[in-house]
């Protein structure tokens, strides 16, 4: 099925190139409804790196350092199974030993 945002249930657009800095770019995007950030791990073997990249983008939105961010207070996250070639997902990942790619999503909580 087409991937949907776990935070607002909106359909997600296919990933595009997102420039992180002058030396690094990734495949990802943002949810058109709630603004959640997503980055693709095509192999499912680099999720730690993808998490740090997405949290870096989230920290920039909050003008904070990544090390100062608190899950539940500053952001919430989810990991979806994902096939970038077909732009399909079976939903929230239930394990990491299935050989599928991943879509790591971070929803930045708005400060009041």
Segments and roles (model prediction):
Residues 5-9, 31-34:
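Short cysteine-rich clusters marking metal-coordination/redox-active sites
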Residues 9-13, 38-39:
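Cys/His-rich microdomains that often coordinate metals
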Residues 18-30:
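Short linker/helix segments within small regulatory modules
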């Amino acid at each position: 099925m087409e991937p949907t945002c776990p935070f607002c249930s909106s359909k997600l657009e296919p990933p595009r190139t997102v420039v992180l800095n002058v030396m690094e770019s990734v495949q990802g995007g943002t949810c058109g409804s709630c603004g959640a950030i997503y980055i693709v791990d095509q192999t499912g073997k680099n999720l730690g790196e993808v998490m740090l990249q997405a949290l870096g983008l989230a920290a920039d939105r909050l003008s904070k350092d990544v090390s100062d961010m608190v899950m539940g207070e500053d952001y919430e996250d989810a990991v979806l199974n994902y096939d970038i070639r077909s732009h399909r997902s079976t939903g929230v990942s239930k394990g990491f030993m299935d050989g599928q790619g991943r879509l790591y999503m971070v929803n930045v909580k708005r400060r009041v």
